[in-house]
Each structure stands twice: as C-alpha cells, then as structure tokens.
Amino acid sequence: METKEERAARLAALMKKLHGFYAEPWKLYHEPFHVAGPIYFVGNTYVSTFLLDTGEGLILIDPAFKETQYLLFDSIRALGFDPHDIRHIFLSHGHVDHVGGTRYLQEYSGAQVWLGEPDAFFFTERPDLIIDADHVPPFTINNYYDYHKEFQMGKVKIRFIATPGHTPGVTTFVIPAEVGGKTVLTAMHGGLGLNGLTRPELDDNRLPYTLQSDFVKGLQELQKLPVDIVLPSHNHNYDMLGRYKQFGGKEEGFIDPGGWQKMLQGVLNQCKNVIPEAFEF
C-alpha cells in the first residue's frame, strides 16, 4: 500500500508537471493524424484530443489545456477541417487537463458542451476538484450524457458508458469505425488515473469510498468489450503515438487485438498496489 510520503511525492510530481505544461505548452506539440474511419487525433503528447467527422459537422472529445488551444486549432486546420464546424464538445471528465480549453472552443464554434452529470458540481460547488481551476475559464454545460441511449450524428454513432472512479463522472466512449471495408470497434476510457482514489485523498476531497470499487468494477466490465483500436485519453496509458510512428499512420496499424484488455489490466495491477481495498466487494 502507498505510504503517506509516497502519496505526497506522487501528487507533488503531478502538479509540477502540470505547471510545466502551462509555462511551455509548445513542448507538447504533436502532428495531427487520421486514426480510423471518421476519427482523427488532434491532441498533444500529454492529453489526447479526438476529432470526429460526422459528415454533418464535427465532434471534438476533450479540448485539453487552455494553454494548448492554439496548437489544437492549428492541428484541426492542418487536417483540412474548420474549428467553426465543431457542433459538440464531449468532455471525458472534469479535470483541468481535459476541460481547460472548453470555453475558448465553445465561444469560437458555438458548440454544445457535454459532461457526465456526476462531475457537474465541480463547476458550481467544488472548483477545487477541477485541479488548478484558475486555468479553466468558466464555460456552459449544455447536456449530460444519456448512458442508456446511443448518440448519432451523421455517419457517427457513439455509446456512452459511465465509468466512475478517477472522478465521479468519468465517461467512456465507444465508437464503431470502418477500416479496410470492415467495421472495427474503437474506445476511449475517459480517466484511468489513480490520483484522487486513495482513501486519504477521498477523505480530503470529501468523496465516497465507493469510487474505488466502482473504478475496479468498471475496468473489469470494460475488459469484456471487443475493442480493436484503443483511443487513449493519455498516451502514457497506451502508446498510440508510438504506433503512429511505427506503422506510418496507416489505419491498420492502430488495430491492436488485446491492446484494450492489456491496458485495463495494467491499471488493475496498479490498483492492487495503490488501492488494494478497492477489491473488497
């Protein structure tokens, strides 16, 4: 089990990393690329951002930092798209590194912003849970995900799955795509970090211990999904950028049978060391 000193060191390292990103956002640049079907990577080396071309407008998943918005806009345009055409912004959860740029993008495009409802109180009652809320200009949440209904816009279908843990409202996105004339399944888990999930952190944040078991149960359940292409919310969870370089950006190169299960199992193994009590259900 993680000691108090180890926990403090882990959290301090995270904050130092974030502050470095705010100060020098250009160091996070990564060229944009096509993933599969309607899905494009327009994120940076720390936070993934995905652009979906529905044929009836664009959907963007996680705008990332406000400090990297100029990189995001450049990446979208480099692929031949116009940020003005973004109709929906899907947020995976309410942390600064995923939502920081939402206000800029929402005002620029007029897009509707979506969030998992359990995270909504971050933006009304508990800005401390956003982490560095002063780096998140206020934005309007227009819609909450319906976890019982598939979302469709043009040629794109998306299934939303509630996967609480990292935050109460983490949402996982499952998106079919066509590769080589065949339908493959892509998926993005909205938040695999263990930061915030130890019991001392849950106490400090006044959040329920049930988030621990919810997280583990969610990972175990998601392992059953026959995912062909992993869309990582962070590249350190799964090296999509490495696969892009390895396979020259070819769609087939992102197909990785078992990659989804391996990624989730790796997080479960971390849970056994950091939050072993999460398995007591």
Regions inferred by a protein language model and the residue ranges of each:
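Short, surface-exposed connector motifs at secondary-structure boundaries
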Residues: T54-L58, D82-I86, G154-V156
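C-terminal regulatory/interaction regions
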Residues: T3, I255-F281
